[in-house]
């Protein structure tokens, strides 16, 4: 065999020949390949399961004392399983509320696997800054209404007025009712593919955010 050519397993099969200059790139052993694979899988697992830590409830300020609370999955996205697709007009609607002086409070019981990158997703899709409260345990995720009601109770104790609320599931509306947010200030979002909104106490079932923007701009007063 030519001194500049060597046999290499894994490149064209056993016995295939490559030059010595290529062998450093192509003649990886099985253990090398497996090490790279395990590293990639491990890194993906760590990234994918990174859980967002609990957020503090800040006190209201003289210039901001009212909050708008809302669910994320199914409310800012078309369905609760479409975690990467924003609803049309959702960011515009929330930015309008933010400009009026309302603090935006995001609530979610999303599983840890899909929590990583949530802050970046909100920012990338143009949603305004706000408090982001994520369920920390399986127990909290299993009882979404209780988890969200507890967060809202913490805001109320801190002195916030819970002015408006948006959601897509019955558990959202249960939490809002427990927080004593008036029915006239609670709105439901219909999920994609559903014939109607889920049961609950709310003023209206919205097809989407775009149709609600005019209402926000004309009917919801400034909180400043």
Give, region by region, the residue ranges found by the protein language model.
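Short, basic, low-complexity termini and linkers enriched in Ser/Thr/Gly/Pro
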Residues: 9-31
